[in-house]
Amino acid sequence: MEYKASGKIAVNDFVREYTIPQAVEFIDKYSPDILWYDADWSEKAAKLGSYEIAAYFYNVSEKPVAINDRYGLGEPEEIAGKFTKERPRQWLRTVRGDFYTDEYGDTSECINAENYHPWEACRGISQSYGNNWQDDENSVLSTKEFVALFADIVAHGGNLLLLVNLDGQGSIPEIQMQRLKEIGKWLSLNGEAIFATRPQAPYTKEGVSYTRSKDGSCAYAIISEPKSEIFLQLMPPKGAILMLLESKSRVKWDYAKNIKGEPGIKVGLPKEAAESKLPVALSVKMK
């Protein structure tokens, strides 16, 4: 079956006379770092021209590039034996592409320590991928919710692709602009716990998301619900320095066990941090 389309330039085969040439032109003109497909539910990849486009992209690129997982329905040999009731068809995204993608989903499904695959969470600040003029404080992520979500994604080894919903004039709605400024302020003070970090077991547990520096010399704990005393499932060396990133002030700690008998440390937060309306981040020297 051919895709027929009419328009300024009539074509008989939409994929091979229009889609593939347009993709090639785009790749040649803009030299993208990523091709982000979004067609994994309609047709098989071969019918959509996905393989031809991917091959061209990889072959002409003179830098590291990546393609996501949504390049078409799976071929029989690709999906054979991969799906059960517990692993439905959408799990094909976890076994293909340079990175797989998740929409408004549960990040706990997106990491497997034994078989990790790069992944990306995709969502808007609001609950829609388009502009909703009715968005208000109840329909968009609060700054606290966003920071906790972002920390959880990074702690699970993921990237966040955040959509900003422009209005009909191409402007950022005020409520979303406010969120971006608040998020930016938090990251300016606590970004060390987010950027260029790696996942740190136990990833996210009991409201705390864990990351670490690339060289492993420092671990980070992002606490979504601050209080005066926090248990962290980390085992720093004796005398290690723990510091609040926002204020650069040291905090007191001691070895302890939680109610399950799991080893870790008990941390005392100062009053200002304990009463914070936003998550707080700690750095923990591990070496």
Short names for language-model regions:
Residues 1-287:
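Mature catalytic domains of secreted/periplasmic carbohydrate-active enzymes
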